[in-house]
């Protein structure tokens, strides 16, 4: 282990148009093969589609969707005495946001549809309303944590 000290936590930058960190986090997660300009195009088209669908501020829809999908608790596999237990752990806000973004993008990639911008906008609108695959994934994780509450002392 290094004796030089701890690395400071990186802060995410905000995107150029909306000046929003959440949008930039989405861009960085949707990015494939280093094509960041394409990732920005996809996100901005999705935001425009949200604006057209809901006729409200698209960033508030995005925030509401993130709030709905972000988990409070997660399960982690822990090996104890030859058997593996799913141990429920509380997670911080940063890790929760990262999980929520991953689930939203995964759910939107699985959706049938024309292009990624359309699928992402549909998933975000559904998540803001309280439905969709990403919300289902969060509820499933919470159910798993509740079912394995007996193993909480294995942390």
Swiss-Prot record:
It is found in: Plastid, Chloroplast. GO terms for molecular function: rRNA binding; structural constituent of ribosome. Part of the 30S ribosomal subunit. The keyword Plastid applies. One of the primary rRNA binding proteins, it binds directly to 16S rRNA where it nucleates assembly of the head domain of the 30S subunit. One of its GO terms (biological process) is translation. Keywords: Chloroplast, Plastid, Ribonucleoprotein, Ribosomal protein, RNA-binding, rRNA-binding. InterPro entries: Ribosomal_uS7 (IPR000235), Ribosomal_uS7_bac/org-type (IPR005717), Ribosomal_uS7_CS (IPR020606), Ribosomal_uS7_dom (IPR023798), Ribosomal_uS7_dom_sf (IPR036823). Its main location: plastid. Belongs to the universal ribosomal protein uS7 family. It comes from Chloranthus spicatus. Pfam families: Ribosomal_S7. Gene3D superfamilies: Ribosomal protein S7 domain. This is Small ribosomal subunit protein uS7cz/uS7cy. It comes from the Eukaryota. The keyword Cell membrane does not apply. One of its GO terms (cellular component) is chloroplast.
């Amino acid at each position: 282990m290094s004796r030089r000290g701890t690395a400071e936590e990186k802060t995410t930058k905000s995107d150029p148009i909306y000046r929003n960190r959440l949008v930039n986090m989405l861009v960085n997660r949707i990015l494939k093969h280093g094509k960041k300009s394409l990732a920005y195009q996809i996100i901005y088209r999705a935001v425009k589609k949200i604006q057209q669908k809901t006729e409200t501020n698209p960033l508030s829809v995005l925030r509401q969707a993130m709030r709905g999908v972000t988990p409070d608790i997660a399960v982690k596999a822990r090996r104890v005495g030859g058997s593996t237990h799913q141990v429920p752990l509380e997670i911080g806000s940063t890790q929760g946001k990262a999980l929520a973004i991953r689930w939203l993008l995964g759910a939107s990639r699985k959706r049938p549809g024309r292009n990624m911008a359309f699928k992402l906008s549909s998933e975000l609108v559904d998540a803001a309303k309280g439905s969709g695959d990403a919300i289902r994934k969060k509820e499933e994780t919470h159910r798993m944590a509740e079912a394995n509450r007996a193993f909480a002392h294995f942390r």
